Swiss-Prot record:
Recorded name of the encoding gene: ZNF626
Main function: May be involved in transcriptional regulation.
Zn finger spans (C2H2-type): 173-195, 201-223, 229-251, 257-279, 285-307, 313-335, 341-363, 369-391, 397-419, 425-447, 453-475, 481-503
Organism in which the protein naturally occurs: Homo sapiens (Human)
Protein name: Zinc finger protein 626
A Gene Ontology BP annotation from the UniProt entry: regulation of DNA-templated transcription
Length: 528
């Protein structure tokens, strides 16, 4: 067995594995590597300090070093077993190592690097060994130096320019299927798994499989519930350091990622990437079940759950299950009173930043989402999506209990509670329960007397936005709800419903009167 060397106790990561490590794990790696090196020195084992150790001591990130800096001090071997030296690139685009295998016939031990060798001609001993080594490595570009009894070899791999591409911005590796380009071939290989469906990393807890090992690592925290990253501003904790970094921008308002196409700015690079697809018409991700196509693989994954009906995300508080993790996260806030997002205009606080953004439009009057069919504008994109169904008349959501169909899944969910009698939303003030959170929100205003929906025309204020919308029709004279029986029009659907009921009852009474037999002679005759 040969002398112990630093590489025997070193821990190595691939580029993909390194990116999966969070800050705490990278710090642990740094401490372990430095400790291992210190132990070798303490034991009196002669080793030259690797550049990796110098890098870690200076607090630099290993992956920011140039490739040639990452190679440990060139390994040295006796020429007797130099012919059995082969390169192996096990750490793609980050580290490279040379596997040195001891030749059985070699008698040299404790090899030391003798500096000062400039060329092969200076080496007087073991010329034969050098020639053998040179012959063995004809296929690999190399620089070979021989000094006395020892040979120094530095391998230069063909893809050593990978680091340079990071600075030039070039993306030479393109995937034909979707047209996406990458700087590194290894990243392209990883990306291909999205299209092929290859998911080699499986969770032992729930059986879910992933394309990348780092995705599996992140997923496991769902089962453990571990949240080591805490926000100093609001105390909220997160599973991943990157999520905490993005979250902090909610407090600062920072949006560093800007779209070159439309100028819109975002808090995270992932949100920008998702947004940029809006500007393209490409939809390379297709559902095999129904043929629907999507511009993001994540959207396809989310869509597939519609067909399976799977609800893997369960609330520990009330046992309610959800299809998506983000829906569970949103739901959990029902059980807490946490409202970290506050409106500077009126002081109202919200559980979600998106709700605050939408709320602000009440003050600004902004309605950025416009219907191409009728020109009507909305504050929320979801309201526009909901509105569009009015034009199509489609009702794809059907109740299995009574067969009633609905335009929106949310309406079906609300309707189902009629059959179950479920009323999960309870008023803390009076104890009254409701089957919809929105009704509870509206109900609470009875206790607070709050009326922040104000008519710009006459100044009248309302507790609900729907009441304000109805009221505005008085000023416009709009009467969109028309009775098919008599042609009379109304400004509220509820008034039309009441009107139709009156006509129905009147018609029923007339039918009864016509069908009723006349009294008189027949009755008298019967009496006689």
């Amino acid at each position: 067995m040969g002398p112990l060397q630093f590489r025997d106790v070193a821990i190595e990561f691939s580029l993909e594995e390194w990116h999966c490590l969070d800050t705490a794990q990278r710090n642990l790696y740094r401490n372990v590597m430095l400790e291992n090196y210190s132990n070798l020195v303490f034991l009196g084992i002669t080793v030259s300090k690797p550049d990796l150790i110098t890098c870690l001591e200076q607090g630099r990130k290993p992956l920011t070093m140039k490739r040639n800096e990452m190679i440990a001090k060139p390994s040295v071997m006796c020429s007797h077993f130099a012919q059995d030296l082969w390169p192996e690139q096990s750490m793609k685009d980050s580290f490279q190592k040379v596997v040195l295998r001891r030749y059985e016939k070699c008698e040299h031990d404790n090899l030391q690097l003798k500096k000062g060798c400039i060329s092969v001609d200076e080496c007087k001993v073991h010329k034969e060994g050098y020639n053998e080594l040179n012959q063995c490595l004809t296929t690999t570009p190399r620089k070979i130096c021989q000094c006395d009894k020892y040979v120094k070899v530095l391998h230069q791999f063909p893809n050593s320019n990978g680091q340079k591409r990071g600075h030039t911005g070039k993306k030479p590796f393109k995937y034909i299927e979707c047209g996406k380009a990458f700087k590194q071939f290894s990243t392209l290989t990883t990306h291909k798994k999205i299209h092929t469906g290859g998911k080699p990393y499986k969770c032992e807890e729930c059986g879910k499989a992933f394309n990348h090992s780092c995705s599996l690592t992140r997923h496991k925290k769902i089962h453990t519930g571990e949240k080591p990253y805490k926000c100093e501003e609001c105390g909220k904790a997160f599973k991943h350091s990157s999520t905490l970094t993005t979250h902090k921008r909610n407090h600062t308002g920072e949006k560093p990622y800007k779209c070159d196409k439309c100028g819109k700015a975002f808090m995270s690079s992932s949100t920008l990437s998702k947004h940029e697809i809006i500007h393209t018409e490409k939809k390379p991700y297709k559902c095999e079940e129904c043929g629907k196509a999507f511009n993001r693989s994540s959207t396809l994954t989310t869509h597939k759950i519609i067909h399976t009906g799977e609800k893997p995300y369960k609330c520990e508080e009330c046992d309610k299950a959800f299809k998506y993790s983000y829906t569970l996260t949103t739901h959990k806030r029902i059980h807490t009173e946490d409202k970290p997002y506050k409106c500077e205009e009126c002081g109202k606080a919200f559980k979600y930043s998106s709700t605050l953004t939408t709320h602000k439009r009440i003050h600004t009057g902004e309605k950025p989402y416009k219907c191409e069919e009728c020109g009507k504008a909305f504050k929320r994109s979801s309201d526009l999506t909901t509105h569009k169904i009015i034009h199509t008349g489609e009702k794809p959501y059907k109740c299995e209990e009574c067969g009633k169909a609905f335009k929106y899944s949310s309406n079906l969910t609300t309707h189902k509670k009629i059959h179950t009698g479920e009323r999960p939303y309870k008023c803390e003030e009076c104890g009254k329960a409701f089957n919809q959170s929105s009704i509870l929100t509206t109900h609470r205003r009875i206790h607070t007397g709050e009326k922040f929906y104000k008519c710009e025309e006459c100044g009248k204020a309302f507790k609900c936005s729907s009441n304000l919308t109805t009221h505005k029709k008085i000023h416009t004279g709009e009467r969109p709800y028309k009775c098919e029986e008599c042609g009379k029009a109304f400004n509220q659907s509820s008034i039309l419903t009441t009107h139709e009921r009156i006509i129905l009852e009147r018609n029923s009474t007339n039918v009864k009167n016509v069908a009723k037999p006349s009294s008189g002679p027949h009755t008298l005759l019967h009496i006689r």
